[in-house]
């Protein structure tokens, strides 16, 4: 499947600092954030004009699920659009707090852990054919996903009883299973709950919940692009060396704690391999696969950055990727800050900087400051991100959903939508079932819109 439906779901961390005496719980802050949404959507679980879903998840975490995308740049644009949507809610909520005499600054973090040790996720979704052998996909993907943090982790300072240590991944410490149907209780690497949001006879949805939330556009593209390419190779019958892990949960933590990528992890049967070895194998197969597939500049870009990042890890010279990969950007930032101020990695100011890197408010968040200074590479433009805030992808089913929502809102009609249904809540209860996520034109939807 060279054209694939993909999406990213991001849960955001929330906190608020107060200027006055009255303090609000995270639940109350979340309610302020979503007050504007509830006022027009009558719910804290809504679909937007750009086809995305916005809702309040378990534990007062706002969650943004992008619309269905079918190429990587489009997906990065819609992922970044989610930050803008949440930033607008943040600004609106701060104004409401001020009007009510509760002075406070609200912070939304696109990260995966809070100071209390709780974790919240960034989930990737990939459409796969129902006909394929799902267990083979899981078997081949698992070693890739366990070691993928080496190339696209968000980076984190982990405070251990002995000392502070820099880790590649925020999510690795919170994963407890390889493949499972649960998402919160056991936090697997791959979630197998079968909810295709499409024709269940043709498709299923691969739900990857091990990844970090990325600030860097290049890292987001690399994270999703490499996974999509490995999936494509599995479907094409490409054979890989057997890297089945003896204990994926131990391995994911060992890999996260080793920025050299050389620490051996145990494979099934007693063999050993490093994260660098494993990623080199997948990358080598990808380079070969590119010779046999239709040319795609985005995929070529992904394979190029993948190779450059592995070279950087091998040589420990990150100069050629230090504007593109989150954990490299962050580690360089920490090292400069430590050198300038003489801080240890365990200093609370480093932890503060770690958190501020993920602050999505423009002009305040550290990543945004680096971006404005030209210290991180971009693959999108502000104009295309702003467009994605209100406009759905034009090549997928999201276009139908977005057009229906826009038309219904402008006509003042009551409606209900989800990923596959578009329904007018009138006497006739007319509903269109959109089971094909690749289809962006549908006469039934056009007729439904025209009837408003």
UniProtKB/Swiss-Prot annotation:
One of its GO terms (biological process) is proteasomal protein catabolic process. Disulfide bonds: none annotated. Coiled coil: none annotated. Keywords: ATP-binding, Ligase, Magnesium, Metal-binding, Nucleotide-binding, Ubl conjugation pathway. It holds the Pfam family Pup_ligase. It catalyses: ATP + [prokaryotic ubiquitin-like protein]-L-glutamate + [protein]-L-lysine = ADP + phosphate + N(6)-([prokaryotic ubiquitin-like protein]-gamma-L-glutamyl)-[protein]-L-lysine. The keyword ATP-binding applies. The keyword rRNA-binding does not apply. Its EC number is 6.3.1.19. InterPro entries: Pup_ligase, Pup_ligase/deamidase. It comes from the Bacteria. Mg(2+) binds at residues 9, 55, 63. The active site is at 57 (proton acceptor). ATP binds at residues 53, 66, 419. One of its GO terms (molecular function) is ligase activity, forming carbon-nitrogen bonds. Pathway: Protein degradation; proteasomal Pup-dependent pathway; Protein modification; protein pupylation. PANTHER family: PUP DEAMIDASE/DEPUPYLASE (PTHR42307), PUP--PROTEIN LIGASE (PTHR42307:SF3). Catalyzes the covalent attachment of the prokaryotic ubiquitin-like protein modifier Pup to the proteasomal substrate proteins, thereby targeting them for proteasomal degradation. This tagging system is termed pupylation. The ligation reaction involves the side-chain carboxylate of the C-terminal glutamate of Pup and the side-chain amino group of a substrate lysine. Belongs to the Pup ligase/Pup deamidase family. Pup-conjugating enzyme subfamily. The reaction mechanism probably proceeds via the activation of Pup by phosphorylation of its C-terminal glutamate, which is then subject to nucleophilic attack by the substrate lysine, resulting in an isopeptide bond and the release of phosphate as a good leaving group. This is Pup--protein ligase. The gene is pafA.
């Amino acid at each position: 499947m060279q054209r694939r439906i993909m999406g990213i779901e991001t849960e955001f961390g929330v906190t608020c600092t107060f200027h006055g005496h009255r303090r609000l719980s995270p639940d109350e802050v979340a309610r302020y954030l979503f007050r504007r949404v509830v006022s027009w959507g009558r719910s804290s679980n809504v679909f937007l004009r750009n086809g995305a879903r916005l809702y309040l998840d378990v534990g007062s975490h706002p969650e943004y699920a992008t619309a269905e995308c079918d190429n990587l740049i489009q997906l990065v644009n819609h992922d970044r659009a989610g930050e803008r949507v949440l930033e607008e809610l943040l600004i609106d909520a701060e104004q409401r707090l001020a009007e009510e005499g509760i002075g406070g600054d609200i912070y939304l973090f696109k990260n995966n852990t809070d100071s209390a040790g709780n974790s919240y996720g960034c989930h990737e979704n990939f459409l796969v054919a129902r006909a394929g052998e799902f267990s083979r996909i899981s078997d081949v993907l698992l070693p890739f996903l366990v070691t993928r943090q080496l190339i696209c982790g968000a980076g984190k300072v982990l405070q251990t009883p002995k000392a502070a240590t820099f880790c590649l991944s925020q999510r690795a410490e919170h994963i407890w299973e390889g493949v499972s149907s649960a998402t919160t209780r056991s936090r697997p690497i791959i979630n197998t709950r079968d909810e295709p949001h499409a024709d269940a006879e043709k498709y299923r949805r691969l739900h990857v919940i091990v990844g970090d939330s990325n600030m860097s556009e290049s890292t987001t593209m690399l994270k999703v692009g490499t996974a999509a390419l490995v999936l494509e190779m599995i479907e094409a019958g490409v054979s890989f060396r057997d890297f089945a892990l003896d204990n994926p949960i131990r391995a994911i933590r060992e890999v996260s704690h080793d920025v050299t990528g050389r620490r051996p992890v145990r494979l099934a049967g007693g063999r050993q391999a490093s994260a660098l070895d494993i990623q080199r194998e997948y990358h080598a197969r990808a380079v070969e696969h590119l010779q046999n597939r239709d040319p795609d500049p985005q995929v070529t870009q992904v394979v190029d950055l993948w190779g450059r990042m592995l070279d950087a890890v091998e040589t420990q010279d990150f100069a050629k990727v230090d504007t593109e990969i989150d954990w490299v950007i962050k580690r360089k930032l920490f090292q400069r800050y430590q050198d300038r101020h003489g801080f240890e990695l365990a200093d609370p100011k480093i932890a503060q900087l770690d958190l501020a890197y993920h602050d999505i408010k423009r002009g305040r968040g550290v990543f945004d400051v680096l971006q404005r200074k030209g210290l991180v590479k971009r693959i999108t433009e502000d104009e295309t991100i702003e467009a994605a805030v209100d406009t759905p992808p034009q090549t997928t089913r999201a276009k139908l959903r977005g057009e229906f929502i826009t038309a219904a809102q402008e006509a003042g009609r009551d409606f209900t939508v989800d990923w596959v249904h578009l329904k007018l809540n009138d006497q006739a209860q007319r509903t269109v079932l959109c089971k094909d996520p690749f289809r962006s034109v549908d006469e039934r939807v056009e007729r439904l819109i025209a009837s408003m």
